[in-house]
Regions:
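Active-site rim helix/loop that mediates acceptor-substrate recognition in acyltransferases
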Residues: 26-49, 61
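Short amphipathic alpha-helix that is part of the acyltransferase structural core
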Residues: 1-34, 51, 156-172
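Conserved acetyl-CoA-binding loop-helix of GNAT-fold acetyltransferases
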Residues: 78, 84-97
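Conserved GNAT acetyl-CoA-binding A-motif
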Residues: 99-114
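Conserved catalytic-core motifs of GNAT/GCN5-like acyltransferases
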Residues: 110-112, 122, 127-144
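Conserved beta-strand in the GNAT
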Residues: 49, 55-64, 70-77
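Short hydrophobic/aromatic beta-strand element in the GNAT-like acyltransferase core
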Residues: 45-49, 59, 75, 108, ...
Length: 172
């Protein structure tokens, strides 16, 4: 697998929406597409795409809080036919390192997700901080997780790359 990650561009929109739709309904309710469209039109932070063989196979971004020592991951998704290939881990590591390079680097990074994807984040070193039955308007349960973006975590990501930094056994 040879992927590259770069900033999202408006001409990526169609491929990003197609990647999102490939995950409906298993990972996203169709109703979240309007939120994605809004985020693409008026992002609150940087957005990125993962590209493999010239095709967009993943998408995600983050937002930084103006008032809190906090970054929030938004729309981390991989095209359904590429799940399990490591693209999600690479995109996650890229976003964490991008945040770490910011002038106002956040101390904590949070993400909210569905129970079926919470395990992915736990294997990448996130800890569960809240669980909300029916926490999404769609009726799905919500899980909130946090990653401590410490100097040690950043050094591990830089030194050994995303594969080794996010050990499959859950130790990060």
């Amino acid at each position: 697998m040879k992927i590259s990650i770069r900033r999202y561009r408006p001409d990526d929109r169609k491929a990003v929406l197609a990647a999102f739709r490939s995950n409906v309904p298993a990972h996203f309710p169709a109703s979240e597409e309007s939120w994605l469209r809004s985020a693409l039109d008026d992002p609150d932070g940087p957005l990125f795409v993962a590209v493999e063989a010239g095709e967009i196979v993943g998408f995600g971004g983050y937002e930084l809080s103006e008032f809190y020592d906090l970054g929030t991951l938004v729309f981390g998704l991989v095209r359904a036919d590429r799940h399990g290939s490591g693209i999600g881990r690479a995109l996650l590591a890229y976003r964490l390192l991008h945040m770490a390079g910011r002038k106002l680097r956040p101390r904590y990074v949070t993400v909210d997700t569905h129970p079926h994807t919470a395990g992915f984040f736990k294997r990448c070193g996130f800890i569960e901080i809240a669980r909300w039955p029916g926490g999404y308007r769609s009726g799905r349960d919500r899980v909130d997780l946090r990653f401590d973006l410490t100097d040690e975590a950043v050094a591990r990501l830089r030194a050994c790359g995303w594969r080794e930094a996010f050990a499959r056994d859950g130790t990060a």
